[in-house]
């Protein structure tokens, strides 16, 4: 019996589960949170026991992934035994905008701090506002009330992404200010932190996943179509990870 238990539970895995950090880290991962280096203790714990914990989670038909940028998250398979949720189209679009802002020169100029309003404005610039409003309400006609509802949905999307560890609030929780985590690269897997930021930004623009004021002026109609397509491509990106969204 002892040998059988040891086959299933290695000494190092037993140490990981017995670690005081395990309950918190396990709960965060199961909720879909991405754990990066900013969570020093939890990140170090995952780095130390990555192999053992990956074997542990595979019994639930999920994988413990360490992205090229370093952050950890659980990727469910189609037969996962752990409850999961999928991001909405708007939440995915907001994630794309956050990835774009992370790469933009403005991040350095603003000491890495952005506001909810900036994300909202960038989303309106990059996407067709009419289609965004229709996504919120099919009968939306562009009234002030419709635009207010869209703004509320954007705030809700940002809150959801914050709970997933993709942004971090700065100052008072009602200030609307935050910094962006590298985990937003789940919305732009083709761009990696080793790339030159300006080159990565240009590539995003060419592929219809971001834009500048100049590119919007030059390719306004085409860009709108590309942003619509980028939402579909983003869904396919998550579906390619065992046909699922973020856990």
From Swiss-Prot:
Q: Which UniProt keywords apply?
A: Cell cycle, Cell division, Chromosome partition, Cytoplasm, DNA condensation
Write out the biased-composition intervals (Basic and acidic residues). 217-227
The domain of life is Bacteria
**Biased segments, Acidic residues type:** 236-247
Mind telling me which GO cellular component terms the entry cites? Answer: cytoplasm; nucleoid
Q: Name one Pfam family in it.
A: MukE
**Quick one: where's region Disordered?**
213-247
The protein's location, in the record's own words, is:
Cytoplasm, Nucleoid
Its BP terms in the Gene Ontology are: cell division; chromosome condensation; chromosome segregation; DNA replication
Which InterPro entries does the annotation name? Answer: MukE_C (IPR042037), MukE_N (IPR042038), Scp_MukE (IPR007385)
Function in brief: Involved in chromosome condensation, segregation and cell cycle progression. May participate in facilitating chromosome segregation by condensation DNA from both sides of a centrally located replisome during cell division. Probably acts via its interaction with MukB and MukF.
The family note in this entry says:
Belongs to the MukE family.
Q: Which HAMAP family match?
A: MukE
What does the record note on quaternary structure? Interacts, and probably forms a ternary complex, with MukF and MukB. The complex formation is stimulated by calcium or magnesium.
The identity of this protein, by name, is Chromosome partition protein MukE
Q: Tell me which species this is from.
A: Histophilus somni (strain 2336) (Haemophilus somnus)
């Amino acid at each position: 019996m002892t040998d059988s238990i040891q086959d299933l539970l290695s000494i190092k895995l037993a140490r990981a589960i017995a670690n005081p950090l395990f309950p918190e880290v396990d709960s965060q991962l199961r909720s879909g949170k991405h754990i990066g280096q900013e969570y020093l203790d939890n990140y170090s714990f995952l780095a130390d026991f990555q192999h053992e914990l990956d074997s542990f989670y595979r019994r639930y038909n999920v994988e413990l992934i360490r992205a090229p940028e370093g952050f950890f998250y659980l990727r469910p398979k189609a037969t996962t035994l752990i409850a999961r949720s999928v991001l909405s189209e708007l939440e995915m679009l907001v994630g794309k905008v956050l990835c774009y802002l992370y790469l933009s020169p403005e991040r350095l100029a603003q000491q890495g701090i952005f506001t909810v309003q900036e994300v909202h404005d960038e989303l309106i610039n990059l996407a067709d506002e009419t289609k965004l409003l229709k996504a919120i309400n099919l009968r939306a006609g562009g009234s002030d009330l419709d635009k207010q509802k869209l703004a509320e949905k954007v705030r809700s999307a940002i809150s959801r992404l914050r709970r997933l560890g993709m942004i971090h609030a700065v100052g008072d929780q009602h200030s609307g200010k935050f910094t962006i985590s590298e985990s937003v690269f789940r919305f732009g897997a083709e761009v990696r932190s080793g790339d030159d930021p300006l080159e990565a930004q240009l590539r995003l623009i060419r592929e219809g996943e971001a834009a500048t004021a100049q590119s919007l002026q030059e390719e306004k109609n085409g860009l709108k179509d590309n942003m619509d397509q980028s939402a579909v491509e983003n869904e396919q990106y998550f579906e390619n990870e065992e046909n699922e969204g973020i856990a």
